[in-house]
């Protein structure tokens, strides 16, 4: 058995598998965030979501329009979003960083399958708890523990997938990014359907969690099928040295096992390598990928700084009392963003301009800073109740919709380009490590964006 020929990705099977895996990394967490109103409702001491029809209707309205106030908010409910952000971003950043350094010590299959199974278990528990009543404090603590677990395993899963895609051709990072973009689209559609149906918030949340479980199971099945494809085995073998052992290794790979000697043979320092050599290797990779790494960090810093902290606070100037008032944020903000973000991510499958060494790439990335004043000068409601804003420049809904479309498309396209280019700027043996480091900088951008969002919202 040899690898002298270069097999084709028959029926785009590997591309589709990575697409589903990308979908599986973000869809569960997106559904979790979409159900935020369900969690805050259960923490309100004066109401129970499932016991009062009128309050359920108010909850559904709140899902559509964040300005609708829920009665008698508890202190736990009031701090839920802030604590959720903290419990999400810190593990995401920490575990992505750890994965960048420790992926040589833990096999790829353990990291990916273990993470998917852990996320599946958390969502099964979350779905079951929808039907269980408990004290608000206990529910709050359990929810935060679940958020930490989801984002910890999600960070390991995402970084491992980008590292795995790094050993394949450059355009195989694109399906991961595209799948993640589609995850946002699905959750936006689910949110709009929940509003239109008028269903109770607890029922909508249960549907979100069960759907997330189904997607994770599909991702597990796809990952198990990946080693059976000749295309994947071929490119994985290219990262292994020692032609005399190729046949044995390919047999192991076909069974879904990772060759024991992969770490040492791939040129990536193993667990017993001197720390100095390992550090020098990582420093060399960082130097090679610094431009795409810093670019993807900057992209997500700007994006998360504005979306949704600022953009979700924009009000329609033409809705009045029409139904558009309830649908404005779900459609003009969330659905609009997720559709164009997905289109931008997907475009890299057929177009990768500018090139990985072009100066235009960092220039285009830096130019996205213009969206900060553009979106902040839209019809954003005042931070304090009763306060009036007088410095609207782009008050009409059309301005906001157009800016959001360009904002989202540039985010998806440029971020996907950077994630594709990063692993291709190093030797093939270092591609997996480069992919993990790129994932770390992506998560760093998310964390910095979360911090920036507080500042930008305070300035409105």
From Swiss-Prot:
Residues 1-12, 108-111, 158-174, 228-291, 343-359, 418-435 are cytoplasmic. Keywords: Cell membrane, Glycoprotein, Membrane, Phosphoprotein, Transmembrane, Transmembrane helix, Transport. GO terms for cellular component: apical plasma membrane; basolateral plasma membrane; plasma membrane; postsynapse; presynapse. The keyword Protein transport does not apply. Glycosylated. Residues 30-82, 131-138, 200-206, 312-323, 379-397, 457-460 are extracellular. Residues 255-277 are annotated as: Disordered. The modification Phosphoserine is found at residues 254, 273. The keyword Membrane applies. Its main location: membrane. Glycans are attached at residue 48. Highly expressed in heart, spleen, lung, liver and testis. Lower level of expression in brain and kidney. Expressed in adipose tissues, brown adipocytes expressing significantly higher amounts than white adipocytes. Expressed in seminiferous tubules. GO terms for molecular function: adenine transmembrane transporter activity; cytidine transmembrane transporter activity; guanine transmembrane transporter activity; neurotransmitter transmembrane transporter activity; nucleoside transmembrane transporter activity; purine nucleoside transmembrane transporter activity; pyrimidine- and adenosine-specific:sodium symporter activity; uracil transmembrane transporter activity. Residues 255-266 have a biased composition (Basic and acidic residues). Uniporter involved in the facilitative transport of nucleosides and nucleobases, and contributes to maintaining their cellular homeostasis. Functions as a Na(+)-independent transporter. Involved in the transport of nucleosides such as adenosine, guanosine, inosine, uridine, thymidine and cytidine. Also transports purine (hypoxanthine, adenine, guanine) and pyrimidine nucleobases (thymine, uracil). Mediates basolateral nucleoside uptake into Sertoli cells, thereby regulating the transport of nucleosides in testis across the blood-testis-barrier. Identified in a complex with STOM. This is Equilibrative nucleoside transporter 1. It comes from Mus musculus. The lineage of its organism: Eukaryota, Metazoa, Chordata, Craniata, Vertebrata.
């Amino acid at each position: 058995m040899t690898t002298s020929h270069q097999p084709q990705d028959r029926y785009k099977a590997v591309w589709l598998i990575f697409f589903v895996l990308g979908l599986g990394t973000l869809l569960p967490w997106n559904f979790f965030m979409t159900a935020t109103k369900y969690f805050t409702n259960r923490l309100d001491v004066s109401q129970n979501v499932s016991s009062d029809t009128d309050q359920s209707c108010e909850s559904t309205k709140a899902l559509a329009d964040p300005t609708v106030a829920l009665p008698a908010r508890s202190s736990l409910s009031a701090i839920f979003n802030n604590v959720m952000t903290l419990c999400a971003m810190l593990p995401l950043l920490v575990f992505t960083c750890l994965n960048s350094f420790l992926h040589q010590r833990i096999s790829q299959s353990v990291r990916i399958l273990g993470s998917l199974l852990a996320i599946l278990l958390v969502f099964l528990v979350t779905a079951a708890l929808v039907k269980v009543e408990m004290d608000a404090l206990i529910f709050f603590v359990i929810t935060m523990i679940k958020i930490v677990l989801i984002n910890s395993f999600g960070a390991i899963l995402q970084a491992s997938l980008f590292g795995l895609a790094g050993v394949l051709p450059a355009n195989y990072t694109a399906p991961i990014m595209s799948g993640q973009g589609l995850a946002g689209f699905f959750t936006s559609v689910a949110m709009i359907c929940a509003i239109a149906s008028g269903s109770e918030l607890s029922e909508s949340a249960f549907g979100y969690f069960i759907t997330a479980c189904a997607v994770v199971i599909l991702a597990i099945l796809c990952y198990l099928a990946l080693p059976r494809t000749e295309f994947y085995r071929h490119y994985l073998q290219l990262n292994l040295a020692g032609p005399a052992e190729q046949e044995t290794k390919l047999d192991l790979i076909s069974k879904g096992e990772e060759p024991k000697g992969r770490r040492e043979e791939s040129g990536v320092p193993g667990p017993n390598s001197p720390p100095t050599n390992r550090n020098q290797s990582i420093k060399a990779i960082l130097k090679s990928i610094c431009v795409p790494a810093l670019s993807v960090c900057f992209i997500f810093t700007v994006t998360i700084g504005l979306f949704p902290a600022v953009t979700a606070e924009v009000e329609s100037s033409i809705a009045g009392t029409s139904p558009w008032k309830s649908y404005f944020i779900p459609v003009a903000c969330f659905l609009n963003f997720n559709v164009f973000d997905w289109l931008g991510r997907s475009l890299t499958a057929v177009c990768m301009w500018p090139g990985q060494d072009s100066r235009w790439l960092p220039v285009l990335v830096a130019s996205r800073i213009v969206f900060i004043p553009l979106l902040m000068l839209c019809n954003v409601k005042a931070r304090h109740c009763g306060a009036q804003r007088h410095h609207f420049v782009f008050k009409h809904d059309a301005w906001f919709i157009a800016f959001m479309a360009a904002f989202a498309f540039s985010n998806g396209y440029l971020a996907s380009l950077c994630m594709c280019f990063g692993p291709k700027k190093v030797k093939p043996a270092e591609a997996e490590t480069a992919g993990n480091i790129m994932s770390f900088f992506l998560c760093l951008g998310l964390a910095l964006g979360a911090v920036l969002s507080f500042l930008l919202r305070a300035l409105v």
